[in-house]
Amino acid sequence: MGYHFYFDREFGRQAVRVNPGGFAIASADVMLATVLGSCVSVCMFDSAARVGGMNHFMLPGSGNGARNDSLSSLYGVNAMELLINGLLRRGALKWRLRAKLFGGGCVMQSLSDTRIGERNAAFVRAYLDAEGIRSVGGDMLGTRPRRVCYFPSTGRALCKRLVRGSDVADIATSERAYDGDLARRLPVAGSVELF
């Protein structure tokens, strides 16, 4: 499941945690939250419709070849389309959408040679540019993981960089597992799928 509900004691309100590979759309007084390392999260909103959403994703693969880069970008396209289409179904208009971008850090040693955080950040910026959706803020790249709290009805986002060693280790473990799962789903060059 891409998200789960909980009560956030720090903010004293209902919240939705968006997990890696997930997204959530909300218009009520609910907070969307996630924790990011190399993954990216796009917080998108339409202020007139008072609806917003958040996704959390990573491009799979090592970035070692045009074919694999092309295949892995399909995961990013899917994550972005799910978010945008979910907002449109809730009354948003594409020309009014604004985005805040987070994540894309270099926090996992085993993935640092692939520059996965940089690839994720570059992908999301290029995608939004191609779709004509303006980025109005965020916090990307660097070496620290982040906790992002997003209030979709207003478009307000808070970002806290995490420094505790245990937080970094937990995020790195979670993202390694997510990357491994995505890599297993990425088709192998020359493979044939029978249907």
Swiss-Prot record:
Residue runs in coiled coils: none
InterPro entries, A to Z: CheD-like_sf, Chemorcpt_Glu_NH3ase_CheD, Cytotoxic_necrot_fac-like_cat
Hydrolase in keyword set: yes
Catalysis performed (reactions): L-glutaminyl-[protein] + H2O = L-glutamyl-[protein] + NH4(+)
Molecular function in Gene Ontology: protein-glutamine glutaminase activity
Keywords, comma-separated and alphabetical: Chemotaxis, Hydrolase
Cystine pairings recorded for this chain: none
One Pfam family hit: CheD
One of the GO BP terms on file: chemotaxis
EC nos: 3.5.1.44
Family: Belongs to the CheD family.
Task of the protein: Probably deamidates glutamine residues to glutamate on methyl-accepting chemotaxis receptors (MCPs), playing an important role in chemotaxis.
Record-given protein name: Probable chemoreceptor glutamine deamidase CheD 2
